Amino acid sequence: NTATVYLLGSVHFMRKDIYPLDSKIEDAFKKSNILVVEANINDAAKADIQRLMANAYYPGSDTLDRHVSRETYDLIKKETERLGIPIQMINKQKTWIISLTLSSLELLKLGFTPADGIDMHFLSRAGGKRIIELESVDYQIRLLSSFSDREQELFLLYTLKDIKTIRQEMEQLLHTWKSGDTKGMELLISKGNSGDAQLAPIYEKLIYERNRRMISRIEEFLRTGETYFVVVGAAHLIGDRGIVRALMDKGYSVEQN
């Protein structure tokens, strides 16, 4: 009855020209004494980085070509050659880290960087605010590496397809984000996986299972007398199975500013 939780959908790769943010957002941040993020990248322990390296590479003599089809391997080779990266440089990398690397490189070329991401913007300005992680770097690494070879390959194929239209999609995402158009953002984000039933189990683990965990934590916050500023990926907030809808269904008062 006494807690306030501000929810802000993050875009993890952002452009500098998005700043300064709307004063309503900054005012909510100033009013909050606790900052909540998915994972505190600034505080990522050395052990987390070592765990990332261990989970991102095939052990021993194992290589990428043993884990994807010949057709997919050729597509990866074509894409890396376009980027000026010899296939030999990534042949030890697992498929999930290649997916993240390829999409990240495209975003960087378009001027979107993780350093300018919404979550990093607030982490860098947390000052004396207490910082709470809804997840952790370690949890996210374990989640991504838990997918089967086939699931990782499907996600990579989706990434290779998505890269072709990433400029247009990011511009649309920026427009919906800045205008607070949750329906437009929902359509944009769901468009990518709606046509492929094989992606549904992946989306279930990447979004909906994590939503349930986050909702449980946010409910804990709402039972305190504190004011929280929660920054999570925008995809977690929107839609019929998103965090906002779940909180409303549970009887909490939710308003969009």
Describe each region flagged by the PLM.
Residues 1-202, 206:
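Structured, acidic catalytic/metal-binding patches in enzyme active sites
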Residues 201-257:
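A cross-kingdom marker for long, charged
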